[in-house]
Amino acid sequence: MHEMKLNPTVFKCPMKILTILIAMLLVSCGTRNPAPVAELLDRIGGEGTSGRIETQIESDLAEEGKEVFEIGSRKGKPFIQGSSMSALTAGIGWYLNHYVHVNLSWNNLTTDLSGVHLPVPAVKERRTCSADYRYYLNYCTYSYSMAFWTRERWEKEIDWMALHGINLPLALVGTDVVWKNMLEEIGYSRAEIDRFIAGPGFQAWWLMYNLEGWGGPNPDWWYKRQEELCSFILRRMRELGMEPVLPGYCGLLPSDAADKLGVKATDQGYWCSGFTRPSFLVPTDEKFDDLAEIYYRQQEKVMGKSRYYSMDPFHEGGSTGGIDLKGAYNAIYSQMRRHSPDSRWVIQSWQENPRKEALEAVPQGGYLVLDLFSDGSPKWMDGYDGHDFLWCMLHNFGGRVGMHGRLDATMKGYSEALRKYPGNMKGIGATPEGIETNPILYDALFELPWMTEDECADWIGRYSEARYGTESDVMKQAWELLASSVLACPTSQQGVSEPVVCARPSLDVRSVSAWSTCGIYHDVAKVRKAAADMLEEKDRLAGHPNYRYDLTDVVRQALTDSSYFLLNDVADSWKRGDKENFRKGYE
């Protein structure tokens, strides 16, 4: 026999071809069972969950640039694919809700799936997302709800975001560290820094340029803690396909900056008649570029870079006198782009913002406008001069407990905006001042972009089954009653109708806290009936955590509604001198 010898020169070309073919095969197969997703599954469902579900990122699934997920089967297991990481995790959330009938929300962020049947779909389901962006959070959320959260709580929240397909969350943790480092670099003493940086419960309004120093000073251990927490939060967000929105630099400086630094910084007066606002460094000042460079450099050390930066000069007031507004907005935008060339300015549409000069100063594609209160006081009707915008639900003003919302208006409003401005209505957002209440609204909002309009009509029935793990006409009816009453606020009322029992004792209670009302806008009989309906299912559902939470919430709402009318009755009896009825009322 003759020994066969391979000619390296001849074999060289086929080897290259083989290598290319293997590479193409790997690309076509996508990324199977990505580690961040496997870890997510084990966190939310218990160890071993990732071994029971096949997952894959397959970019070729995308449909005309829109994200897609598919739910099918492979190797006898559920198989969930997404065109992106966030599409994949949204698909997992959809599978849990609508196949496994397990609904994870703030009252129940994890579960044990070890003994739960995971259905293997016989037919593949495909969903295309109409929203390029799914935004989440409000500056206020960081103070009303998140000020003292631990790493463990943040981990669960980011998992919740992933399951809801959120790909653009506001990220503020660590910004106080950035400012401390920046101010030290430009010559501020620790005492001066302490007078400027607000405490954790008030940093939302500090970062929106409404106040300075309130609730501080912060100890050294706090800054160390926040820097470590910031690193974890941003790393986990990015692992799960989210692009954090970081706070950019638009001229914020301590109120003494004009004297301290010798810059042209305008006095911004007071916010809410009592809080000293930070000064505004006029962006045409010769030192603006240098200070912006220092800010972004210090921020990159702590938070990294982003393609999205949030800035809202003159938020809820401030003085624009003597400022070339178009020049100022253009300078702010230019510095952001110098630091991150492909970045976009995320700006809140709230009260006077964004001003006409702002829309004129920045080119198309430069802004991403958050129509902050679309569900109650929309401003998107004129289309923001062609700038891209997001339809947002602003919920839970003041971080108060109670049932309130606009479920039907949310479902219809998003579709209406998409029809009117298909070119620049780019997505959806939840911009709550506080969270951890009314989970139905957030489940509806973030499923909206993955549904057709026709599917909205019977969504409550599907939600009820997902929420409690079983079909129940009684629970479905209860939610329909709530959706047509307390979750159907007909006005722009900012938040819940506060319970009179929480107010200072008086026969004429109109509000409990600032910017609120105790007035009731809904049919309280429907809420009472919903509570009674839910109680009917106690024997069957008492062991379910979502049922226990919802029953408590709805009964509480029914009782606080009753207290409003009871107080009015007592007050009327007092005014009439009807002692007997008065005594019955307060007893």
Language model: regions and residue ranges:
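Catalytic-core regions of glycoside hydrolase
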Residues: N103, N107-L118, L137-T141, A162, ...
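Histidine-centered catalytic/metal-binding microenvironments
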Residues: A514-E587
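N-terminal structural segment of carbohydrate-active enzymes
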Residues: A90, A131-G174
